[in-house]
Amino acid sequence: MTSEISCFKAYDVRGRIPSELNQEIAFKIGAGVASHFSTKSVVVGYDVRPSSLDILDALARGIASHDSEVISIGLCGTEEIYFATNHLNTDAGVMITASHNPADYNGLKIVGSGAMPVSIDSGLGDIKSIAESVAYNPNIKPDIKDADIRDAYLDEILSFINVRNIKPMTIVVNSGNGCAGPVLSLIHI
């Protein structure tokens, strides 16, 4: 049975929790991602929203329903998912975030291998069609593997500058409610 999933937008998935995006829908989208990309592995990460861990659990079950490995980099920024998709050589990456939307929303940003962003015209529409036809199975138990990519990510960021050319200074950064704080606190130049 096909039922319309309304949280698909032009470049990502966003919806109010739980009416437009919930565990059942996240499961179906996870299955859609795994099916569309014929994945062997998918890297996932999430932001600080209260619903992110529930969405992660359901998304991982959906991905696992297609015998795909789920690799979590944990709490992170969207840019870290782009990096991890390349660095870990996964078939896809999914960031659980609703970006600037209100607190009662959450969403998913999806990239293919090589960290290629997916839009409604380049795969997101296909993922939506697959997700709408998937049967929800909350009993699947995903084997989520954790990966720490922070050191490699920092090395990549710092490779763009010559730190010897930077004069010593003190910089104060407030990442607000964003996820850049853990990365920024590791940078000591």
For each feature predicted by the language model, list its residue ranges.
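Ferredoxin-reductase
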Residues: F37-S113
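Conserved adenylation A10 loop of the ANL superfamily
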Residues: D12, H188-I189
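Active-site flanking residues adjacent to catalytic metal/cofactor-binding acidic residues
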Residues: Y11, Y46, I96, V173-G176
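An N-terminal, well-structured beta->alpha segment
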Residues: M1-R61, S65-D67, D146-M169
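Gly/Ser/Thr-enriched, mixed-charge loops and adjacent short helices
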Residues: N106-I187
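Residue-level signal for pocket-adjacent positions within structured domains
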Residues: T2-Y11, A103-N106, S113, S122
